[in-house]
């Protein structure tokens, strides 16, 4: 459950380390984002010579949450951190590598590139 002001780790090699959610996209008064939702973020920490700089405003897709994902069989998949992957204006990942596991819920036609780059799909 990601909301405005939530801090997330960045699960890719774009150069950002931590981002902060500034808007949950998909509705005028939408409050929470879960795995697979697109959010607007600002970069709070970045490494030198990365693709993004501190202060950049970008789109991101949530790939892991502490709250978890409920599957149709009743099981819940929870993670140790809240993480996102940065996207460009065309909703494609700007990075070439993804770190850590991602969930099967991202397998829609929109995020197959992220699923294919991920080392593990749960």
Swiss-Prot record:
Q: Which SMART domains match?
A: Ribosomal_L14
Entry's Gene Ontology molecular function annotations: large ribosomal subunit rRNA binding; structural constituent of ribosome
Q: Can you tell me which residues the record assigns to a coiled coil?
A: none
Q: What does this protein do?
A: Binds to 23S rRNA. Forms part of two intersubunit bridges in the 70S ribosome.
Enumerate the InterPro entries for this protein.
Answer: Ribosomal_uL14, Ribosomal_uL14_bac-type, Ribosomal_uL14_CS, Ribosomal_uL14_sf
Name of the featured protein: Large ribosomal subunit protein uL14
Tell me the HAMAP family matching this sequence: Ribosomal_uL14
Pfam families, sorted:
Ribosomal_L14 (PF00238)
Q: Which gene encodes it?
A: rplN
Q: Name one GO biological process term.
A: translation
- Gene Ontology annotations for the cellular component aspect, listed alphabetically: cytosolic large ribosomal subunit
Q: What does the UniProt keyword field contain?
A: Ribonucleoprotein, Ribosomal protein, RNA-binding, rRNA-binding
How does this chain assemble?
Part of the 50S ribosomal subunit. Forms a cluster with proteins L3 and L19. In the 70S ribosome, L14 and L19 interact and together make contacts with the 16S rRNA in bridges B5 and B8.
Q: Record's superkingdom?
A: Bacteria
Instruction: Please give the family membership noted in the entry.
Output: Belongs to the universal ribosomal protein uL14 family.
């Amino acid at each position: 459950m990601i909301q405005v002001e939530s801090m997330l780790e960045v699960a890719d090699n774009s150069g950002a380390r931590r981002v902060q959610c500034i808007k949950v996209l998909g509705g005028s008064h939408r409050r929470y984002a879960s795995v697979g939702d697109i959010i607007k973020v600002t970069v709070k920490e970045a490494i030198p010579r990365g693709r993004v700089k501190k202060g950049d405003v970008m789109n991101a897709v949530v790939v892991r949450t502490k709250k978890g994902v409920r599957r149709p069989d009743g099981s819940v998949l929870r993670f140790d951190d809240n993480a996102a992957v940065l996207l460009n204006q065309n909703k494609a990942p700007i990075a070439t590598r993804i770190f850590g596991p991602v969930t099967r819920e991202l397998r829609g036609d929109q995020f197959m590139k992220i699923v294919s780059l991920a080392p593990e799909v749960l």
